[in-house]
Amino acid sequence: MGYHINYKWASLGTGVIANELAQALEALGGKLYSVANRTYDKGVAFAEKYGIEKVYKEIDEVFEDPEVDIIYISTPHNTHIQYLRKALAAGKHVLCEKSITLNSEELAEAIKLAEENHVKLAEAMTIFHMPIYRKLSEIEIGRASCRERV
C-alpha cells in the first residue's frame, strides 16, 4: 500500500535528523516544501540536495509563510521553546525533535499554545537508533521477530 504526503512541510534545521526526515518523506511520496536554518548557505545546500523549492533568508519567515502546514523543528534543544512559541502561535502544526522542551513548564506552555491555536504538537521520539532497540531487534520469538515494526 502506498502513501502520499499532501502537506507542505518546512524543516527548521538541516542536521542529520532533518536529512532523515527528508528521506522518509520522499519514501512516502512527499517532500519538504521549505527549509530555514541559522546559516543560510547550509539551508541552500540542504534544499538543493532534496529539491526543496523555498529557502528562507531569516528563520522567522517560516512562521509567516501561509503555504506551510507543518514545521519540523530539529534545532538545538535550548532553542525549541522559542520556535515552538512562534510556530504554534502562527497556527502551524509542529513535529519537534526530542527533547521537545527543557522542562515541564515549557512543555505545559507549548501544549496550551497548541490547544489554543487548534493545531497538533508532537515530539519526534524514536527508539530505533537506541542501542537497546538494536539488541532487541536481534531477538527472535517463535515465528515473529523484533525486527518488524508494528
Identify the role of each PLM range:
Residues 30, 69, 92, 119-120:
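Short, well-ordered coil/turn segments that N-cap beta-strands
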Residues 32, 52, 68-71, 145:
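Local beta-strand N-terminus motif with an aromatic residue
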Residues 12, 97, 124:
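Short hydrophobic "strand-cap" motifs at the C-terminus of beta-strands
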